[in-house]
Structure formats: C-alpha cells, structure tokens
Swiss-Prot record:
Domain of life: Eukaryota
Record motif Twin CX3C motif, residues: 44-67
GO molecular function: metal ion binding; protein transporter activity
Free-text comment on this protein's domains from its UniProt entry: The twin CX3C motif contains 4 conserved Cys residues that form 2 disulfide bonds in the mitochondrial intermembrane space. However, during the transit of TIM8 from cytoplasm into mitochondrion, the Cys residues probably coordinate zinc, thereby preventing folding and allowing its transfer across mitochondrial outer membrane.
Pfam families linked to this entry: zf-Tim10_DDP
Cellular compartments per GO CC: cytosol; mitochondrial inner membrane; mitochondrial intermembrane space protein transporter complex
Localization of this protein: Mitochondrion inner membrane
The keyword Cell cycle belongs to this UniProt entry's keyword annotation: no
Name recorded for this polypeptide: Mitochondrial import inner membrane translocase subunit tim8
One of the GO biological process terms: protein insertion into mitochondrial inner membrane
Length: 98
C-alpha cells in the first residue's frame, strides 16, 4: 500500500521539478488572464452593448475600449498604491513618484 503522506514531487529530478514549476506558473498566468477577461466582460459588457448583432458598431467598440482602459487604469492605481504602502521606501529609492 502506498504511503499517503509521501510527497511525489520529492521523487522528481531537479530538472523535472523546474519544468513542473514552470508549467504551474504558466497555468496560473492563464487563470489570471481568464479572470481578467471575465471581469472586463462582466463590468463593461452591460455598460456598452445594447443589442447583440453580428458585429459591434463603432460606439460599442469605443465604449468597450474605454471601459477596459479605465478598468486597467484603476487596477494599476490600486496596485501602485498598495505597493507604495508596502514597499514605499524602495519605490522612492528607485525614483518612482512617492
């Protein structure tokens, strides 16, 4: 009977562990991208799309573009604010506005 407490990753070679780590990181990045797309869609779609047709009209396209850009701007601002609170001295030292 197999030992349930044994870590199977420990049996991998160093190169296999590195490959597994890179694969997991890649999958996590895909999940983050999918989450961002879901957030963009749930935030911007109701604001910008009236009737569903074969393609977006110019105003819908522009609205979606502006909405996503504002969404990204807000998220960047929040991340920057958090980073400044957490690592402010480092950001100031590196020359970012503080």
């Amino acid at each position: 009977m197999a030992d349930a407490t044994k870590n199977p990753i420990a049996d991998l070679s160093e190169s296999e562990q590195l490959e597994l780590s890179k694969f997991i990181e890649s999958e996590q990045q895909k999940v983050k991208l999918q989450q961002a797309i879901h957030q963009f869609t749930s935030t911007c779609w109701p604001k910008c799309i009236g009737n569903i047709g074969n393609k977006l009209d110019k105003s819908e396209e522009q609205c979606l573009q502006n909405c996503v850009e504002r969404f990204l701007d807000c998220n960047f601002h929040i991340i920057k604010r958090y980073a400044l609170e957490k690592f402010g001295f480092l950001f100031c030292w590196l020359g970012f506005s503080c």
